[in-house]
């Protein structure tokens, strides 16, 4: 029996996205809003759609997403990662294409912590010799 929906979890920076794909018309819903309502920037919308355009699945699935944490860029990246993982659940043959584009690998770069005795992670306070 084939599954009615496909699930994938995506992460980027401090954002976590849970993505469900269902066969449908191509409607993308993020936190109960349309993609256009949720993301103001065109680049964020483009990032979210990249795995679908690459695998030629645009308009074949209705996508429901819940995402939390981080900012716009991190959330868009997390959704992209989640959609990629859900597409792999749909068809494992897409793995080569998605891996080549670098969508399967989790981007592990996160914010470096602030150190004590310093202004930021690496920036020090101004130093005066005399």
UniProtKB/Swiss-Prot annotation:
GO terms for biological process: translation. GO terms for cellular component: cytosolic small ribosomal subunit. Keywords: Ribonucleoprotein, Ribosomal protein. Belongs to the universal ribosomal protein uS9 family. GO terms for molecular function: RNA binding; structural constituent of ribosome. The keyword Nucleotide-binding does not apply. PANTHER family: RIBOSOMAL PROTEIN S9, SMALL RIBOSOMAL SUBUNIT PROTEIN US9M. Pfam families: Ribosomal_S9. The keyword Ribosomal protein applies. This is Small ribosomal subunit protein uS9. InterPro entries: Ribosomal_Su5_D2-typ_SF, Ribosomal_uS9, Ribosomal_uS9_bac/plastid, Ribosomal_uS9_CS, Ribsml_uS5_D2-typ_fold_subgr.
């Amino acid at each position: 029996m084939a599954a009615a929906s496909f699930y994938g979890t995506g992460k980027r920076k401090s954002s976590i996205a849970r993505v469900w794909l269902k066969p449908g018309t191509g409607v993308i819903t993020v936190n109960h809003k349309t993609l256009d309502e949720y993301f103001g920037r065109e680049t964020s919308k483009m990032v979210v759609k990249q795995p679908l355009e690459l695998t030629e699945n645009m308009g074949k699935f209705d996508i429901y997403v819940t995402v939390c944490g981080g900012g716009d860029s991190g959330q868009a990246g997390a959704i992209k990662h989640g959609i990629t993982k859900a597409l792999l659940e749909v068809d494992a043959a897409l793995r080569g294409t998605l891996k080549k584009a670098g969508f399967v690998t989790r981007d592990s770069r996160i914010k470096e912590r602030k150190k004590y005795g310093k202004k930021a992670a690496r920036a020090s306070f101004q130093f005066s010799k005399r």
